[in-house]
């Protein structure tokens, strides 16, 4: 028996999805030269500070994924936890954290990925998903795609199928979305920004 409940989506708004996406885009703060010179950091925290805008943001993902019926949502450390856990709650499904190496207390599997200068690793608990689970992988932003690709590989190593990768922001100039799509991962993003 499926114990999912209908989403608690706002019904009092009359805005279109494009209006919603414009609101989301306008609310994201751009911080120049952070964390290093030349970088235009896309800060999603203003989206979370307004209950109205946060609801609009979550509703975008609820509308997308309610009928697709994933078995679980896996969120990438750390901002993917914010969106992913709320979305999992709205869809009445489980949430799986994919953490930076050394942050999970139980038995884990690890996947490394390349950074601009060096490498990093993420981990997942070995019992986080079951073979055959259909999982949505979510983060706040797609830049180079390295973290999301590592998350995809972790979930697949545990036997899950990643049905889609999702993010609020795509930075297409960094090539991550193209790389992920070329690796067979469908993507859903709400807004894109030129420059990085």
UniProtKB/Swiss-Prot annotation:
NCBIfam families according to UniProt: apt (TIGR01090), PRK02304.1-3 (NF002634), PRK02304.1-5 (NF002636)
Its biological purpose: Catalyzes a salvage reaction resulting in the formation of AMP, that is energically less costly than de novo synthesis.
Catalytic activity, EC: 2.4.2.7
Subunit structure of this chain's protein: Homodimer.
Organism: Methylibium petroleiphilum (strain ATCC BAA-1232 / LMG 22953 / PM1)
A GO molecular function held by the record: adenine binding
Protein family (similarity comment): Belongs to the purine/pyrimidine phosphoribosyltransferase family.
Name the UniProt record assigns to this protein: Adenine phosphoribosyltransferase
Name of a matching Pfam family: Pribosyltran
One Gene Ontology cellular component annotation held by this UniProt entry: cytoplasm
Signal peptide start and end residues: none
Pathway assigned to this chain's UniProt record: Purine metabolism; AMP biosynthesis via salvage pathway; AMP from adenine: step 1/1
Swiss-Prot/TrEMBL keywords: Cytoplasm, Glycosyltransferase, Purine salvage, Transferase
Catalytic activities: AMP + diphosphate = 5-phospho-alpha-D-ribose 1-diphosphate + adenine
Underlying gene: apt
GO BP terms, alphabetized: adenine salvage; AMP salvage; purine ribonucleoside salvage
């Amino acid at each position: 028996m499926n114990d999912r409940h209908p989403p608690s989506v706002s019904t009092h708004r009359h805005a279109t999805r494009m209006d919603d996406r414009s609101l989301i885009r306008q609310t994201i703060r751009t911080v120049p030269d952070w964390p290093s010179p030349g970088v235009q950091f896309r800060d999603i925290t203003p989206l979370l500070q307004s209950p109205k805008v946060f609801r609009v943001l979550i509703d975008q993902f609820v509308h997308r994924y309610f009928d697709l019926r994933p078995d679980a949502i896996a969120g990438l450390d750390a901002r993917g936890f914010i969106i992913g856990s709320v979305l999992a709650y709205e869809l009445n499904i489980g949430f799986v954290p994919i953490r930076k190496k050394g942050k999970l207390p139980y038995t884990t599997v690890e996947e490394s990925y390349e950074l601009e200068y060096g490498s990093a690793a993420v981990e997942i608990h070995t019992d986080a998903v079951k073979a055959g689970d259909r999982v949505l992988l979510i983060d706040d932003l797609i830049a180079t795609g390295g973290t999301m690709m590592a998350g995809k590989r972790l979930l697949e190593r545990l036997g899950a199928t990643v049905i889609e990768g999702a993010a609020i922001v795509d930075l297409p100039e960094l090539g991550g979305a193209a790389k992920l799509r070329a690796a067979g991962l469908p993507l859903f993003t709400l807004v894109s920004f030129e420059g990085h």
